[in-house]
Amino acid sequence: MNNLPQKCRSVVGLHFCRKFSCGNVLYQDTAKKTVLYDFHKKHDGKMVDFAGWMMPVQYKALGIKASHHHTRKQASLFDVSHMLQTKIYGKDKESFIESLVVGDIKGLNANSGTLSLLTNENGGILDDLIINKTNEGYLYVVSNAGCSDKIKAHFKDQVQSFKSQGGDVLIEHNDNGLLALQGPAMVDVLQNGMKQKLSELPFMTNVEDIIFGIPNCRVSRCGYTGEDGVEISIPIEKTVEMAEALLENPKVELAGLGARDSLRLEAGLCLYGNDIDESTTPVEASLTWCIGKRRRAEANFPGAEIILKQIKDKPDRRRVGLTISSSIARHGAEVEDEKGTKIGIVTSGCPSPTLSANIAMAYVARKHNKVGKTVLVNIRNKKIPATVTKMPFVPSNYYFVK
């Protein structure tokens, strides 16, 4: 990893580069571009290859730390158009998706959503995704860019199998733009541009609306920062217009992958390919809450036998937060006990701009993963003390209707 470009190491962190190439490793000849690529260049975005897409890691106007703070205090605009957006139709659409994920999708209210997990027969996580039930007769699903090809193929295979058994379902992937407006000023910025009262749209609900004169937009109150925010799905030909309209507000600044990563880590949110993958189960990943009560009783999701046994007996390891006394623990750093025995591994780590401390996520053995426990992290051959810490590291500010 030391052979990676310096901007990968210092700006985004090594964990971004483990699976997704940055800067000079893979460049524009092979990477795809979102509809906002020229917009990013116009606004002096520093572009890197992430998950096969040319994306801004930061902008000239604000460094990553300043962008991070701006998101916590005002509002930042992120391009997340590289993510896979899918619509699922048919009278059996909920039964179909429940045959693949651990969540209670049938139990969702109209225009509400949930984080869920696609699992395999071994209980491993194929992807994490947001599933929204809409009033327009379809499920709206957002999943990770890095898993796009895998998930498309998986959906295709599963649709064929489901239909062969008489099920009625249709999958449609769309190329809409996707913008995330995140931060406490989001409501002030967005409310004047839409009919829906945001005071009546709590966390993890969604609505189709006309936004700043642009029809057929879907607004979902969610995000990847721990702040109040929305993700807006926009017809591709209107995405630049929407971005420019939002950026006209002086409370809004553009933000890139660098700030997005430190924000999500402070919020205790996983990055697929680093913190979760096909070798980790929902229970090991501390995502047991994603498994619906009814789904546990029915035990009919992929890997249910293994996952439910782990819920009952406790897994041998679990994803936890670490606060580190000094130095930055990057992906792959080993966690040890006081005797020098390996007891875990770091999956993500960065300096926390909010806390002015070094934080990380790690999988740690059961005996050592209790909050308050002191462990050692091997950083450049030095044993650095760290404390197992409850996540999120920074309190979340999601909006709920009282």
Model-derived features with residue positions:
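Context-dependent free N-terminus signature
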Residues: 1-3
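Glycine-rich, Trp-frequent "lid" loop and neighboring beta-strands that shape
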Residues: 130-131
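Acidic, proline/glycine-enriched N-terminal capping motif
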Residues: 5-8, 13-119, 124
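Conserved, structured C-terminal
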Residues: 5, 16-17, 21-51, 55-59, ...
